[in-house]
Protein backbone atom coordinates (compact mmCIF):
# COMPACT_ATOMS: atom_id res chain seq x y z
CA UNK A 1 0.00 0.00 0.00
CA UNK A 2 1.52 3.42 -0.98
CA UNK A 3 1.58 6.47 1.30
CA UNK A 4 -1.37 8.08 -0.49
CA UNK A 5 -3.67 5.11 0.12
CA UNK A 6 -2.45 4.72 3.70
CA UNK A 7 -3.18 8.37 4.44
CA UNK A 8 -6.59 8.11 2.79
CA UNK A 9 -7.50 5.03 4.86
CA UNK A 10 -6.33 6.71 8.06
CA UNK A 11 -8.56 9.70 7.32
CA UNK A 12 -11.54 7.44 6.76
CA UNK A 13 -10.94 5.64 10.05
CA UNK A 14 -10.71 8.93 11.89
CA UNK A 15 -13.97 10.10 10.32
CA UNK A 16 -15.66 6.87 11.40
CA UNK A 17 -14.36 7.28 14.96
CA UNK A 18 -15.74 10.81 15.05
CA UNK A 19 -19.11 9.68 13.71
CA UNK A 20 -19.22 6.89 16.28
CA UNK A 21 -18.51 9.32 19.11
CA UNK A 22 -21.23 11.67 17.87
CA UNK A 23 -23.75 8.83 17.71
CA UNK A 24 -22.88 7.75 21.23
CA UNK A 25 -23.36 11.30 22.45
CA UNK A 26 -26.73 11.57 20.71
CA UNK A 27 -27.83 8.25 22.21
CA UNK A 28 -26.81 9.39 25.68
CA UNK A 29 -28.80 12.61 25.25
CA UNK A 30 -31.86 10.69 24.05
CA UNK A 31 -31.68 8.27 26.98
CA UNK A 32 -31.24 11.19 29.36
CA UNK A 33 -34.25 12.99 27.90
CA UNK A 34 -36.44 9.94 28.39
CA UNK A 35 -35.61 9.35 32.04
CA UNK A 36 -38.97 10.63 33.21
CA UNK A 37 -40.88 8.36 30.80
CA UNK A 38 -41.62 4.63 31.21
CA UNK A 39 -40.50 3.98 27.62
CA UNK A 40 -37.63 5.25 25.53
CA UNK A 41 -38.36 7.82 22.83
CA UNK A 42 -37.73 5.21 20.15
CA UNK A 43 -40.22 2.88 21.81
CA UNK A 44 -42.88 5.59 21.76
CA UNK A 45 -42.38 5.85 18.01
CA UNK A 46 -42.23 2.09 17.54
CA UNK A 47 -45.42 1.28 19.44
CA UNK A 48 -47.33 4.49 18.80
CA UNK A 49 -49.84 3.04 16.32
CA UNK A 50 -50.53 0.29 18.81
CA UNK A 51 -50.86 2.49 21.89
CA UNK A 52 -53.47 4.73 20.30
CA UNK A 53 -55.84 1.78 19.97
CA UNK A 54 -58.10 2.28 22.97
CA UNK A 55 -58.29 -1.41 23.88
CA UNK A 56 -54.53 -1.59 24.49
CA UNK A 57 -54.64 0.82 27.42
CA UNK A 58 -52.17 3.30 25.97
CA UNK A 59 -48.81 3.71 27.68
CA UNK A 60 -49.88 1.70 30.72
CA UNK A 61 -50.78 -1.22 28.48
CA UNK A 62 -47.47 -0.97 26.66
CA UNK A 63 -45.62 -1.06 29.96
CA UNK A 64 -47.54 -4.23 30.84
CA UNK A 65 -46.31 -5.81 27.62
CA UNK A 66 -42.76 -4.66 28.33
CA UNK A 67 -42.84 -6.22 31.80
CA UNK A 68 -44.28 -9.56 30.65
CA UNK A 69 -42.43 -12.81 29.99
CA UNK A 70 -43.94 -15.22 27.47
CA UNK A 71 -42.67 -18.72 26.68
CA UNK A 72 -43.38 -20.20 23.25
CA UNK A 73 -43.07 -23.99 23.08
CA UNK A 74 -42.39 -24.84 19.45
CA UNK A 75 -41.03 -22.62 16.67
CA UNK A 76 -42.90 -24.39 13.88
CA UNK A 77 -46.11 -23.72 12.00
CA UNK A 78 -47.87 -22.09 14.97
CA UNK A 79 -44.88 -20.53 16.69
CA UNK A 80 -43.54 -18.86 13.54
CA UNK A 81 -46.46 -16.42 13.13
CA UNK A 82 -46.99 -15.96 16.87
CA UNK A 83 -43.38 -15.07 17.69
CA UNK A 84 -42.85 -12.02 15.46
CA UNK A 85 -46.21 -10.52 16.44
CA UNK A 86 -45.42 -10.90 20.13
CA UNK A 87 -41.98 -9.42 19.55
CA UNK A 88 -43.34 -6.62 17.40
CA UNK A 89 -45.94 -5.79 20.05
CA UNK A 90 -43.18 -5.31 22.61
CA UNK A 91 -43.45 -8.32 24.92
CA UNK A 92 -40.42 -7.77 27.14
CA UNK A 93 -39.02 -11.30 27.28
CA UNK A 94 -39.76 -14.18 24.95
CA UNK A 95 -38.53 -17.72 25.56
CA UNK A 96 -38.42 -20.26 22.72
CA UNK A 97 -38.33 -24.03 23.31
CA UNK A 98 -37.44 -26.16 20.28
CA UNK A 99 -34.68 -28.67 19.62
CA UNK A 100 -35.53 -29.28 15.95
CA UNK A 101 -33.56 -27.86 13.06
CA UNK A 102 -34.92 -26.00 10.05
CA UNK A 103 -35.64 -28.25 7.06
CA UNK A 104 -36.58 -27.32 3.52
CA UNK A 105 -39.95 -29.04 3.97
CA UNK A 106 -40.76 -26.56 6.78
CA UNK A 107 -40.43 -23.40 4.74
CA UNK A 108 -43.81 -23.33 3.00
CA UNK A 109 -45.50 -22.70 6.35
CA UNK A 110 -42.78 -21.75 8.85
CA UNK A 111 -42.07 -18.42 7.20
CA UNK A 112 -40.03 -17.00 10.06
CA UNK A 113 -37.20 -19.27 8.82
CA UNK A 114 -35.59 -19.11 5.37
CA UNK A 115 -33.50 -21.19 2.97
CA UNK A 116 -30.21 -19.85 4.31
CA UNK A 117 -31.05 -21.28 7.75
CA UNK A 118 -31.69 -24.89 6.74
CA UNK A 119 -29.87 -27.01 9.32
CA UNK A 120 -29.95 -24.27 11.98
CA UNK A 121 -31.79 -24.81 15.25
CA UNK A 122 -35.29 -23.41 14.92
CA UNK A 123 -35.07 -21.61 18.24
CA UNK A 124 -31.88 -19.86 17.11
CA UNK A 125 -33.35 -18.97 13.71
CA UNK A 126 -36.40 -17.52 15.47
CA UNK A 127 -34.20 -15.60 17.90
CA UNK A 128 -32.26 -13.98 15.07
CA UNK A 129 -35.45 -12.95 13.29
CA UNK A 130 -37.30 -11.39 16.20
CA UNK A 131 -34.28 -9.62 17.70
CA UNK A 132 -33.73 -7.93 14.35
CA UNK A 133 -37.41 -7.04 14.30
CA UNK A 134 -37.31 -5.55 17.80
CA UNK A 135 -33.97 -4.94 19.57
CA UNK A 136 -35.77 -3.74 22.72
CA UNK A 137 -36.83 -7.23 23.79
CA UNK A 138 -34.93 -10.04 25.48
CA UNK A 139 -35.00 -13.49 23.86
CA UNK A 140 -34.00 -16.71 25.62
CA UNK A 141 -33.65 -19.99 23.71
CA UNK A 142 -34.01 -23.53 25.01
CA UNK A 143 -32.67 -25.96 22.36
CA UNK A 144 -33.99 -29.03 24.20
CA UNK A 145 -36.88 -31.44 23.95
CA UNK A 146 -39.42 -30.60 26.63
CA UNK A 147 -39.88 -33.41 29.15
CA UNK A 148 -40.90 -34.10 32.74
CA UNK A 149 -37.38 -33.43 34.00
CA UNK A 150 -36.80 -29.98 32.52
CA UNK A 151 -40.28 -28.46 32.10
CA UNK A 152 -40.56 -26.90 35.56
CA UNK A 153 -37.14 -25.25 35.34
CA UNK A 154 -37.93 -23.84 31.89
CA UNK A 155 -41.45 -22.63 32.70
CA UNK A 156 -40.53 -21.02 36.01
CA UNK A 157 -40.61 -17.23 35.86
CA UNK A 158 -42.80 -16.91 32.75
CA UNK A 159 -46.20 -15.23 32.93
CA UNK A 160 -47.81 -16.98 29.96
CA UNK A 161 -47.10 -20.02 27.82
CA UNK A 162 -48.00 -20.63 24.19
CA UNK A 163 -48.32 -24.33 23.39
CA UNK A 164 -47.42 -24.50 19.71
CA UNK A 165 -46.64 -28.23 19.65
CA UNK A 166 -48.24 -30.94 17.55
CA UNK A 167 -48.54 -33.94 19.87
CA UNK A 168 -51.05 -34.84 22.60
CA UNK A 169 -48.21 -36.01 24.83
CA UNK A 170 -46.60 -32.57 24.92
CA UNK A 171 -49.97 -30.83 25.32
CA UNK A 172 -50.72 -32.84 28.46
CA UNK A 173 -47.23 -32.14 29.82
CA UNK A 174 -47.42 -28.39 29.11
CA UNK A 175 -50.85 -28.12 30.71
CA UNK A 176 -49.94 -30.19 33.77
CA UNK A 177 -46.77 -28.23 34.51
CA UNK A 178 -48.50 -24.89 33.89
CA UNK A 179 -51.30 -25.77 36.32
CA UNK A 180 -48.77 -26.66 39.01
CA UNK A 181 -46.97 -23.35 38.46
CA UNK A 182 -50.15 -21.28 38.14
CA UNK A 183 -49.46 -20.17 34.55
CA UNK A 184 -52.12 -19.49 31.91
CA UNK A 185 -51.64 -21.34 28.60
CA UNK A 186 -52.71 -20.38 25.09
CA UNK A 187 -52.98 -23.72 23.30
CA UNK A 188 -53.60 -24.41 19.62
CA UNK A 189 -53.20 -27.06 16.96
CA UNK A 190 -53.60 -27.29 13.22
CA UNK A 191 -53.66 -29.86 10.45
CA UNK A 192 -54.54 -29.74 6.79
CA UNK A 193 -56.84 -26.76 6.31
CA UNK A 194 -58.12 -26.54 9.88
CA UNK A 195 -57.04 -25.41 13.32
CA UNK A 196 -58.30 -24.89 16.84
CA UNK A 197 -57.40 -22.63 19.76
CA UNK A 198 -58.24 -22.33 23.44
CA UNK A 199 -57.02 -20.82 26.71
CA UNK A 200 -56.15 -23.21 29.54
CA UNK A 201 -55.86 -22.65 33.30
CA UNK A 202 -56.92 -19.01 33.02
CA UNK A 203 -55.88 -17.29 36.26
CA UNK A 204 -55.99 -20.68 38.00
CA UNK A 205 -59.79 -20.75 37.69
CA UNK A 206 -60.17 -21.91 34.08
CA UNK A 207 -60.15 -25.55 32.94
CA UNK A 208 -56.93 -27.32 32.03
CA UNK A 209 -56.29 -29.63 29.09
CA UNK A 210 -57.32 -32.68 31.15
CA UNK A 211 -60.66 -31.04 31.96
CA UNK A 212 -61.40 -31.00 28.24
CA UNK A 213 -59.77 -34.34 27.44
CA UNK A 214 -59.54 -36.67 30.48
CA UNK A 215 -58.32 -39.44 28.19
CA UNK A 216 -56.10 -39.01 25.12
CA UNK A 217 -57.24 -39.92 21.61
CA UNK A 218 -56.23 -43.40 20.40
CA UNK A 219 -52.79 -43.35 18.73
CA UNK A 220 -54.17 -44.36 15.35
CA UNK A 221 -56.43 -41.27 15.41
CA UNK A 222 -53.52 -38.85 15.79
CA UNK A 223 -52.05 -37.48 12.56
CA UNK A 224 -49.04 -35.18 12.41
CA UNK A 225 -48.55 -32.51 9.77
CA UNK A 226 -45.71 -34.65 8.42
CA UNK A 227 -48.23 -37.40 7.71
CA UNK A 228 -51.39 -35.42 6.99
CA UNK A 229 -49.95 -32.22 5.53
CA UNK A 230 -50.85 -28.64 6.29
CA UNK A 231 -51.70 -25.46 4.35
CA UNK A 232 -49.32 -22.69 5.42
CA UNK A 233 -51.75 -19.74 5.57
CA UNK A 234 -54.28 -21.82 7.54
CA UNK A 235 -51.84 -22.74 10.30
CA UNK A 236 -50.45 -19.21 10.08
CA UNK A 237 -53.83 -17.67 10.87
CA UNK A 238 -54.22 -19.89 13.92
CA UNK A 239 -50.74 -18.92 15.13
CA UNK A 240 -51.59 -15.26 14.64
CA UNK A 241 -54.77 -15.72 16.67
CA UNK A 242 -52.62 -17.19 19.44
CA UNK A 243 -50.67 -13.92 19.53
CA UNK A 244 -53.94 -11.94 19.68
CA UNK A 245 -55.23 -14.00 22.62
CA UNK A 246 -51.90 -13.59 24.42
CA UNK A 247 -52.03 -9.81 24.05
CA UNK A 248 -55.59 -9.82 25.42
CA UNK A 249 -54.42 -11.80 28.44
CA UNK A 250 -51.51 -9.46 29.12
CA UNK A 251 -53.61 -6.32 28.70
CA UNK A 252 -56.30 -7.59 31.06
CA UNK A 253 -59.08 -7.84 28.49
CA UNK A 254 -60.06 -11.15 30.08
CA UNK A 255 -60.97 -10.99 33.77
CA UNK A 256 -62.16 -13.51 36.34
CA UNK A 257 -65.63 -12.04 35.91
CA UNK A 258 -65.92 -12.09 32.11
CA UNK A 259 -63.82 -15.09 31.10
CA UNK A 260 -65.72 -18.08 29.79
CA UNK A 261 -63.94 -21.25 28.56
CA UNK A 262 -64.06 -21.54 24.78
CA UNK A 263 -62.75 -23.45 21.80
CA UNK A 264 -62.28 -21.63 18.51
CA UNK A 265 -62.39 -23.74 15.34
CA UNK A 266 -60.97 -22.36 12.10
CA UNK A 267 -61.54 -23.92 8.68
CA UNK A 268 -59.86 -22.59 5.56
CA UNK A 269 -61.60 -24.70 2.89
CA UNK A 270 -63.87 -24.58 0.97
CA UNK A 271 -64.98 -21.26 2.45
CA UNK A 272 -63.17 -19.78 5.43
CA UNK A 273 -65.06 -19.99 8.69
CA UNK A 274 -64.36 -19.29 12.35
CA UNK A 275 -66.64 -20.72 15.01
CA UNK A 276 -66.41 -20.35 18.78
CA UNK A 277 -67.85 -22.99 21.09
CA UNK A 278 -68.49 -22.59 24.80
CA UNK A 279 -66.62 -25.26 26.76
CA UNK A 280 -67.18 -26.67 30.22
CA UNK A 281 -65.33 -25.15 33.15
CA UNK A 282 -62.81 -26.61 35.56
CA UNK A 283 -63.76 -30.13 36.63
CA UNK A 284 -63.78 -31.05 40.32
CA UNK A 285 -62.62 -34.59 39.56
CA UNK A 286 -59.78 -33.50 37.28
CA UNK A 287 -56.57 -35.30 38.22
CA UNK A 288 -54.51 -32.16 37.66
CA UNK A 289 -56.57 -29.14 38.75
CA UNK A 290 -59.40 -30.76 40.72
CA UNK A 291 -59.90 -30.87 44.48
CA UNK A 292 -58.15 -34.19 44.98
CA UNK A 293 -55.53 -33.85 42.29
CA UNK A 294 -52.78 -36.42 42.02
CA UNK A 295 -50.73 -34.87 39.22
CA UNK A 296 -48.37 -32.79 41.32
CA UNK A 297 -44.96 -31.27 40.69
CA UNK A 298 -43.33 -34.06 42.65
CA UNK A 299 -45.19 -36.78 40.74
CA UNK A 300 -44.28 -35.27 37.38
CA UNK A 301 -40.60 -34.72 38.16
CA UNK A 302 -40.20 -38.19 39.67
CA UNK A 303 -41.58 -39.72 36.48
CA UNK A 304 -44.66 -41.11 38.18
CA UNK A 305 -46.78 -39.59 35.39
CA UNK A 306 -45.82 -41.68 32.37
CA UNK A 307 -46.94 -39.52 29.46
CA UNK A 308 -45.74 -41.98 26.83
CA UNK A 309 -47.75 -44.79 28.39
CA UNK A 310 -50.78 -42.54 29.02
CA UNK A 311 -50.94 -41.24 25.45
CA UNK A 312 -49.85 -44.53 23.91
CA UNK A 313 -47.99 -44.93 20.68
CA UNK A 314 -48.91 -46.60 17.45
CA UNK A 315 -46.85 -49.78 17.19
CA UNK A 316 -45.36 -50.07 13.72
CA UNK A 317 -42.86 -52.79 14.61
CA UNK A 318 -45.15 -55.63 13.67
CA UNK A 319 -43.01 -57.51 11.14
CA UNK A 320 -40.38 -60.17 11.71
CA UNK A 321 -36.87 -59.47 10.34
CA UNK A 322 -37.35 -61.96 7.48
CA UNK A 323 -40.51 -60.09 6.44
CA UNK A 324 -38.53 -56.94 5.71
CA UNK A 325 -35.90 -56.04 3.12
CA UNK A 326 -33.45 -53.14 3.00
CA UNK A 327 -33.52 -50.52 0.27
CA UNK A 328 -30.26 -52.02 -1.06
CA UNK A 329 -31.86 -55.44 -1.35
CA UNK A 330 -34.92 -53.89 -2.94
CA UNK A 331 -32.70 -52.05 -5.44
CA UNK A 332 -31.17 -55.35 -6.56
CA UNK A 333 -34.48 -57.07 -7.23
CA UNK A 334 -36.03 -53.90 -8.66
CA UNK A 335 -33.28 -53.63 -11.28
CA UNK A 336 -33.83 -57.24 -12.34
CA UNK A 337 -35.34 -57.35 -15.83
CA UNK A 338 -37.84 -59.92 -14.60
CA UNK A 339 -38.87 -57.94 -11.52
CA UNK A 340 -42.50 -57.50 -12.55
CA UNK A 341 -42.73 -61.06 -13.79
CA UNK A 342 -41.64 -62.34 -10.39
CA UNK A 343 -43.18 -59.76 -8.05
CA UNK A 344 -46.23 -57.67 -7.41
CA UNK A 345 -45.11 -54.18 -6.40
CA UNK A 346 -47.59 -52.45 -4.10
CA UNK A 347 -47.49 -48.81 -2.95
CA UNK A 348 -49.81 -48.28 0.03
CA UNK A 349 -49.47 -44.49 0.38
CA UNK A 350 -52.58 -42.30 -0.01
CA UNK A 351 -53.40 -41.65 -3.66
CA UNK A 352 -52.51 -37.94 -3.52
CA UNK A 353 -49.07 -38.89 -2.16
CA UNK A 354 -48.65 -41.42 -4.97
CA UNK A 355 -49.51 -38.80 -7.58
CA UNK A 356 -46.74 -36.50 -6.35
CA UNK A 357 -43.98 -39.07 -6.89
CA UNK A 358 -43.90 -42.83 -7.40
CA UNK A 359 -42.26 -45.81 -9.08
CA UNK A 360 -44.00 -46.32 -12.44
CA UNK A 361 -44.15 -50.08 -11.85
CA UNK A 362 -45.93 -49.78 -8.50
CA UNK A 363 -49.67 -50.33 -8.13
CA UNK A 364 -51.25 -47.89 -5.69
CA UNK A 365 -53.71 -49.31 -3.17
CA UNK A 366 -53.82 -47.08 -0.06
CA UNK A 367 -53.65 -48.97 3.21
CA UNK A 368 -57.07 -47.60 4.16
CA UNK A 369 -58.54 -49.32 1.09
CA UNK A 370 -56.78 -52.56 2.02
CA UNK A 371 -58.34 -52.42 5.48
CA UNK A 372 -61.77 -51.76 4.00
CA UNK A 373 -61.49 -54.98 1.95
CA UNK A 374 -61.51 -56.88 5.26
CA UNK A 375 -59.49 -59.81 3.92
CA UNK A 376 -61.70 -60.38 0.85
CA UNK A 377 -59.36 -61.73 -1.86
CA UNK A 378 -61.88 -61.07 -4.64
CA UNK A 379 -61.98 -57.37 -3.79
CA UNK A 380 -58.19 -57.25 -3.88
CA UNK A 381 -58.14 -59.05 -7.24
CA UNK A 382 -60.37 -56.32 -8.66
CA UNK A 383 -57.41 -53.99 -8.14
CA UNK A 384 -54.70 -56.60 -8.74
CA UNK A 385 -56.09 -59.19 -11.19
CA UNK A 386 -52.83 -61.16 -11.27
CA UNK A 387 -52.46 -61.59 -7.51
CA UNK A 388 -52.66 -65.11 -6.09
CA UNK A 389 -52.10 -66.55 -2.64
CA UNK A 390 -48.55 -67.62 -3.60
CA UNK A 391 -47.58 -64.30 -5.25
CA UNK A 392 -44.38 -62.55 -4.19
CA UNK A 393 -45.51 -59.14 -2.96
CA UNK A 394 -43.21 -56.21 -2.18
CA UNK A 395 -44.82 -53.32 -0.28
CA UNK A 396 -43.63 -49.73 -0.13
CA UNK A 397 -44.87 -46.67 1.76
CA UNK A 398 -43.42 -43.28 2.66
CA UNK A 399 -41.31 -44.16 5.72
CA UNK A 400 -41.64 -47.92 6.14
CA UNK A 401 -44.39 -47.78 8.75
CA UNK A 402 -47.67 -48.32 6.91
CA UNK A 403 -45.93 -50.91 4.73
CA UNK A 404 -45.36 -53.01 7.86
CA UNK A 405 -49.03 -52.74 8.79
CA UNK A 406 -49.98 -53.66 5.23
CA UNK A 407 -47.63 -56.66 5.31
CA UNK A 408 -49.26 -57.88 8.50
CA UNK A 409 -52.71 -57.26 6.98
CA UNK A 410 -52.00 -59.23 3.80
CA UNK A 411 -50.56 -62.12 5.74
CA UNK A 412 -53.01 -62.32 8.61
CA UNK A 413 -56.26 -61.22 6.94
CA UNK A 414 -55.82 -62.26 3.31
CA UNK A 415 -53.66 -65.33 3.88
CA UNK A 416 -50.67 -64.42 1.70
CA UNK A 417 -47.36 -66.00 2.65
CA UNK A 418 -44.73 -64.25 0.50
CA UNK A 419 -45.04 -60.60 1.53
CA UNK A 420 -42.19 -58.24 2.42
CA UNK A 421 -42.01 -54.53 3.12
CA UNK A 422 -39.16 -52.17 2.25
CA UNK A 423 -37.48 -50.95 5.44
CA UNK A 424 -37.41 -47.14 5.60
CA UNK A 425 -39.78 -46.81 2.67
CA UNK A 426 -39.76 -44.51 -0.33
CA UNK A 427 -37.82 -41.74 1.39
CA UNK A 428 -35.07 -44.11 2.56
CA UNK A 429 -34.70 -45.30 -1.03
CA UNK A 430 -34.39 -41.71 -2.23
CA UNK A 431 -31.84 -40.83 0.48
CA UNK A 432 -29.65 -43.90 0.00
CA UNK A 433 -30.12 -44.93 -3.62
CA UNK A 434 -31.54 -42.29 -5.95
CA UNK A 435 -31.58 -38.61 -4.99
CA UNK A 436 -33.00 -37.64 -8.40
CA UNK A 437 -36.48 -38.77 -7.34
CA UNK A 438 -38.69 -35.94 -5.97
CA UNK A 439 -38.89 -36.04 -2.17
CA UNK A 440 -41.88 -34.20 -0.71
From Swiss-Prot:
The lineage of its organism: Eukaryota, Fungi, Dikarya, Ascomycota, Saccharomycotina. InterPro entries: MOCS3/Uba4, Rhodanese-like_dom, Rhodanese-like_dom_sf, ThiF/MoeB/HesA, ThiF_NAD_FAD-bd, Ubiquitin-activating_enz. GO terms for cellular component: cytoplasm; cytosol. This is Adenylyltransferase and sulfurtransferase UBA4. The modification N-acetylmethionine is found at residue 1. It comes from Saccharomyces cerevisiae (strain ATCC 204508 / S288c). Residues 339-438 form the Rhodanese domain. The keyword Transcription does not apply. Binds 1 zinc ion per subunit. Pathway: tRNA modification; 5-methoxycarbonylmethyl-2-thiouridine-tRNA biosynthesis.
